[in-house]
Swiss-Prot record:
It comes from Desulfatibacillum aliphaticivorans. This is Threonine--tRNA ligase. Keywords: Aminoacyl-tRNA synthetase, ATP-binding, Cytoplasm, Ligase, Metal-binding, Nucleotide-binding, Protein biosynthesis, RNA-binding, tRNA-binding, Zinc. It comes from the Bacteria. Homodimer. GO terms for biological process: threonyl-tRNA aminoacylation.
Length: 636
């Protein structure tokens, strides 16, 4: 007799081996139809896999995020089969699930979006056929023989440990895969091809160029329709287009992947950093600055020279190797070592807006989201073990304040100890419990990623959610046991002995360039008044009032507003239209009446106009709005 324990504690008995699918049908036929896979004693497997001993099961359904990932994995196989049906000489490589869909890298002649209709037609045939996904196992030798005509697959197989290797069949199509998969191709309800691009095999420019075919899939057509609508909205908000339209930044081939910020872009940049500095000063941080280029010996000590050199820009100066920093951390360690520290000095909270450079292949560069030169808002907190919980909680509270100012929601993920680590069991236990206790005290829900921490410490990843519901991983709170050891950091304890400090490395904006790109799309270029590059523009109706227009601009600039003026020989309607296209929050029209009365006609971005506003009344409304960083439009 086999006892199967369900999530609610109920036990289902079976006379012999039973599949997860049969157990699900025992609950109800309707429930079984919505099941995608099953966890048996924590191990994810196909519904068809026999359960041969007593076990606890958890069913993965179409309503679970994990269920969607499994179905998209199966969709990648469906797409791959369609490609081979249409292009028999194509060679499949890898096809992982990614955020919002999947892709498959294929060695084949170039294709374009013009080929998508016939590929999707073939895909739909495979879906309608409801072909079962069948898992089979081979020895390593058998797998190598099976794929002897596909050098990409044999390369992957050769790197696997000896033992059984799984493949999945759907009709006459077979692919190398760990699984699991949905029961049959019919559960891939809607599959749409999204785009195609070139990609080097394993990201190596010396290896063959492949066709990377992207797709997405959902359990019903409504979800697909909503997703496509979201993509259309995202296109309108594309920060690359808005960056040009709003005159914020540009890129030039003379410095690929390194943004040039224009005057308006720098106003936005400075407003963002002024807020960062204000909040960090209140939270007890000092601001530091370290050199952009440092000697090879530092990078050897930090481990970057050995592990990260291919991503670093290096130079030979007077027979010494130097590298432009890809990270701010090692410089922060040197700063700590410039003084002797007592336990009474701790915690030390030191932040840096540091410019870093990382070599990225030209093919992966993408606006402000993926660049070669960017600034990180790194901070290092040095403390005793007893301070971990309070310091983590302090960072979480700072994160809450700052993200909420931008109207960004977020969720937290705690990543715990992986298999290979440095540090003792006791250090890891104290560190992890400190992070966990701080998360519990914060009152926010969080997800645990078991074994997903770095080798040098557990971490908290912070994923923000923008106005379109997209998530972005920006902030990180990383407990680091590696660099304090490598740089021999110490403090003198109450016992008058030297001790190793605990160090937290954290970022909130992350890459500031990337964060700006996210904000541009989050706000669709319509920044709140406090953040807007230009907060108000004076629009002169004619040359006769140019003097008054300049006087208004000067008075408002003196009060601290970021101002522009439009004295062009254009109609007032064109000036208003241009200001609206530039998404300037406040448009101040001045003509003969306004000059005579010493007033303004104030137009807001929502099209409302208020006449007869004095400059003092204008400032009484606007300044508190800016000082409190109010996200709403000003009401006059």
């Amino acid at each position: 007799m086999i006892n199967i324990t369900l999530p609610d504690g109920k036990i289902v008995e079976s006379d012999g081996p039973v599949s997860g699918e049969d157990v699900a049908k025992g609950i109800s036929e309707g429930f079984a139809r919505n099941c995608v896979a099953v966890e048996v004693d924590g191990k994810l497997t196909d519904l068809s896999t026999p359960i041969e001993t007593d076990a606890s099961v958890v069913f993965i359904t179409t309503k679970d995020e994990q269920g969607l990932d499994i179905m998209r994995h199966s969709a990648a196989h469906v797409m791959a089969e369609a490609i081979l049906n249409l292009y028999p000489d194509a060679k499949l490589t890898i096809g992982p699930v990614i955020e919002d869909g999947f892709y498959y890298d294929i060695d084949m002649p170039p294709i374009s979006e013009d080929d998508f209709p016939k590929i999707e037609q073939e895909i739909n045939k495979i879906i309608k056929a409801k072909k079962p996904f069948v898992r089979k196992t081979l020895s390593k030798a058998e797998a190598l023989d099976f794929y002897k005509d596909n050098a990409f697959k044999t390369e992957l197989i050769s790197e696997l440990e000896d033992g059984t290797i799984s493949i999945y069949e759907q009709g006459g199509f077979t692919d190398l895969c760990r699984g699991p998969h949905v029961p049959n191709t019919g559960l891939v309800k809607t599959l749409k091809l999204m785009k195609v691009s070139g990609a080097y095999w394993r990201g190596d420019s010396e290896r063959p160029m492949l066709q990377r075919l992207y797709g997405t899939a959902f359990f019903d057509k409504k979800e697909l329709k909503s997703y496509l609508h979201l993509l259309e909205e995202a296109k309108k908000r594309d920060h690359r287009k808005l960056g040009t339209a709003l005159d914020l930044f540009s890129f030039h081939e003379e410095a690929a992947g390194m943004p040039f910020f224009h005057a308006r872009g720098m106003e936005l940049w400075n407003a963002l950093l002024a807020y960062w500095r204000e909040e960090h000063k209140k939270a007890g941080y000092v601001e530091t600055k370290t050199p952009i280029m440092l000697n090879k010996s530092l990078w050897e000590r930090s481990g970057h020279w050995e592990n990260y050199r291919e991503n670093m820009y290096t130079s030979l100066i007077e027979d010494f190797d130097y590298a432009i920093k890809p990270m701010n951390c090692p410089g922060g360690m040197l700063l700590y070592k410039t003084k002797h520290h007592s336990y009474n000095d701790l915690p030390i909270r030191a932040g840096e807006i540091g410019l870093v450079h990382r070599h990225e292949l030209s093919g992966v560069l993408s606006g402000l989201f993926r660049v070669r030169a960017f600034h990180q808002d790194d901070a290092h907190i040095f403390m005793t073990e007893e301070m971990i919980e309070d310091e983590i909680l302090g960072v979480l509270q700072l994160v809450e304040r700052m993200y909420s100012t931008f109207g960004l929601g977020f969720h937290l993920e705690l990543s715990t100890r992986p298999e290979k680590t440095i540090g003792t069991d006791e250090q890891w236990e104290k560190a992890t419990e400190g992070l966990r206790a701080a998360l519990d005290k914060s009152g926010r829900d969080y997800k645990i990623n078991e074994g997903d921490g770095a080798f040098y410490g557990p971490k908290i990843d912070i994923h923000i959610k923008d106005a379109l519901g997209r998530t972005w991983q920006c902030g990180t709170i990383q407990l680091d046991m590696n660099l304090p050891e490598r740089f021999d950091l110490t403090y003198v304890g109450a016992d008058n002995q030297r001790h190793r400090p605990v160090m937290i490395h954290r970022v909130i904006y992350g890459s500031i360039e990337r964060f700006l790109g996210i904000l541009i799309e989050h706000y669709a270029g319509k920044f709140p008044l406090w953040l807007s590059p230009c907060q108000a523009v004076v629009l002169a109706m004619n040359d006769d009032v140019a003097g008054y227009a300049k006087e208004v601009k000067a008075r408002l600039e003196e009060a601290g507003l970021r101002m522009e003026i439009d004295l062009r020989a254009e109609s007032i309607n064109k000036k208003v239209r241009d200001a609206q296209l530039s998404k300037i929050p406040l448009m101040l029209t001045v003509g003969g009446k306004e000059e005579a009365a010493q007033t303004l006609a104030v137009r807001t971005l929502d099209g409302k106009v208020k006449y007869g506003v004095t400059i003092d009344n204008f400032l009484d409304k606007v300044l508190p709005h800016i000082e409190t960083r109010n996200p709403d439009l000003v009401e006059f």
